[in-house]
Amino acid sequence: MWFMYVLSWLSLFIQVAFITLAVAAGLYYLAELIEEYTVATSRIIKYMIWFSTAVLIGLYVFERFPTSMIGVGLFTNLVYFGLLQTFPFIMLTSPNFILSCGLVVVNHYLAFQFFAEEYYPFSEVLAYFTFCLWIIPFAFFVSLSAGENVLPSTMQPGDDVVSNYFTKGKRGKRLGILVVFSFIKEAILPSRQKIY
């Protein structure tokens, strides 16, 4: 009995490690795509904001969600449109960015308060959080590396196979969040060099 219990915890640990590595690789690739195609990324984020707005209106009309929760969500989407005006250069000290961060916290508070009082299945609660609260801030977070002046940038050679694959052989500046991912990659999986 105890042996199977230990095996289950060991397998859970291995599965979490693989999932974490897969998510990190996916984020790295997404950040590369966003840096390469900033205009398309801006358009996609704009469509995501419109979709989130339509979902909020649908929740108000069909599901009778509270007016305050929907109103704050719609105002948050309006602030996100303001962030798109300077995309991909998002200033972390701009009033729009600070206001959007504060509104994310307020939206979460209102959502937790509402779902604590009203019963909805977990899948429906998760759908609300995904489409109305998480997807747009996540898109802006991943795209922070698209602007050259957003995060500190450094020069890195990127001579390994993975970097050459992602950059298609381009040499040059590695910017933003990609520097963080590259640092983490080197810290966790350092490259081996033959010493003669």
Swiss-Prot record:
One family name in Pfam for this protein: Erv26
Coiled-coil intervals: none
GO cellular component, one term: cytoplasm
Subcellular location: Membrane
Keywords linked to the UniProt accession: Membrane, Transmembrane, Transmembrane helix
Distribution of this protein across tissues and organs: Detected in testis.
GO BP field: endoplasmic reticulum to Golgi vesicle-mediated transport; positive regulation of apoptotic process
Gene Ontology MF, one: COPII receptor activity
Stretches that traverse the bilayer: 3-23, 42-62, 70-90, 97-117, 125-145
Bilayer topology annotation: Multi-pass membrane protein
Family recorded in the similarity comment: Belongs to the SVP26 family.
Protein known as: Protein TEX261
Lineage: Eukaryota, Metazoa, Chordata, Craniata, Vertebrata
Encoding gene, per UniProt annotation: Tex261
